[in-house]
Amino acid sequence: MLPLMTHRDSPDPRRRQLLRVGLASTALVLPGLGPGLRAGHAGNGVDAFDLDWHDARRDRPVPVRVYLPARTHEPLPLVLFSHGIGGSRHGYRYLGEHFAAEGFASLHIQHVGSDRSLWAAGSPLSLVARLQTAAQASEAIARVHDLRFALDAVLAGPLGARLDPQRVVAAGHSYGANTALLAAGARVVREGRVLDLREPRLRAVILLSAPPFYGEPALPPILGGVDIPSLHVTTTDDVIRIPGYHSAVDDRVAVYQAIGGPRKLLAVFEGGSHAIFTDRASPGGPWLNARIKTATRELATAFLHGTLAGDDAALRAWPQRHAERIARLEAVGVPGLVVLPG
């Protein structure tokens, strides 16, 4: 069984419905961009596009949302974002809009076998069983194929001319971090064979609350072969709670310690929770929630600028800006960064 697990995009179904209505009311079809592409202005110089793709080979829908800078003529680096279990393409908006405002395209993939439909399908009494089914190896593998299909589709489609295929990054939260790890080169053995799902076009990976590989006796054989830069972000109270899949912050640290690559960074925030990295404003309380989100998105873009453009100035300055919230900061391959051992 491959890992698992996060929280839904929003705790309130009425809030999710209002969001859907609001997006639908502002959407328009852009001429020249092809069928299935709908757009709305997200503010702050950012445009957001919904695309409803279908992978014919697997007969599986792959809905996505793309965040782009509203005005740019340069080819954009691309972030492929994978949501946690029970999420959707509309989640992690705070990251998508920030990436776009900083000059990146951010493509948020919805994984239909482990998306928000889990919360509404069937009886509440069977919810745990549905979550456990969504965490099985077949869905974990399908998620990586979703990511690869989305990358192929966006590069081959009308938006491809605006993107730089040499600067592609995978990112994800919880189950989505597991998806990103598998795409980055994590190798697990199932039924006597190695599952090598590596996507060679990835230049780096961003992991929010990465779970362990459940049932595996050791992480180094799985993660030691990852050879691209990685950013790991968690909190001291980052705990996954689901029957059969309990995981705390020590597991996030173990993933960081086991992973290979020439450059890696671990940031552990004081306080917070597993759900604080979603769009929800309540986990940790409004004050802490807002500050951890701000620190996370600034760290992510600083890491990307350093990794993709070779400029670590923002990354070296980041700890001083957020020192009061950092419980632990470690790094390999980031010269001049002041670390804070936990």
Description of each model-found segment:
Residues 36-68, 202, 334-337:
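A domain-start/cap signature at the N-terminus of enzymes
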Residues 57-163:
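Serine-hydrolase catalytic machinery in alpha/beta-hydrolase-like enzymes
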Residues 152-220:
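Primarily recognizes the serine-hydrolase "nucleophile elbow" in alpha/beta-hydrolase
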Residues 271-273, 278-342:
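Alpha/beta-hydrolase-fold serine-hydrolase catalytic core, especially in secreted/extracellular enzymes
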